[in-house]
């Protein structure tokens, strides 16, 4: 289920009452009881390393690379994937990565009822706890689609909302996607160049396919040169 164009066009973006990211990129709720979303790294020259959409059965070489380079990341796992590939999920924790929630089935969360939002988060937390042995404290909404209603439900489950400052768009690389590899390379290069002025960034990347994982492995030497720290977020 996608976002309704009518809902987006009719939303009051000036007052932005719901802090709806999909409409306004809002990450700082006006409601005092809700924490702001994590979007950037406050530490200078820091690459906040995050990967969405895992785990799956093709990750061994990628996880081997991260382990060899002593790289730790925040991994946003889909609940159904954890159910289908439990050994890969267990390795994520064993290798020292932070395990976070990316919902059960990767829907636009603001299109769901309260009960559906709760289920997407709760059952993902539960399968991670049952399979991996930890209770996640962080989550990322698929497509970044979150508003105050969804944030409040996540907050009630003890989950901090994490978005991103920079998007590699690696998920859209050809042949599965629409963008040539050269465009994804440029996206990475643009983020890498930010490190030269001491920026702290949270980068959206994916472990969804071999080509997205290969892209990070190829770019890592440049990332390491430009940023003093390449770290998970929690």
Where are these regions (language model features)?
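Catalytic domains of cell-wall/extracellular-matrix polysaccharide-remodeling enzymes
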Residues: 83, 107-229, 234
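Active-site beta->alpha N-cap acidic-glycine motif
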Residues: 1-108, 116, 120, 125-137
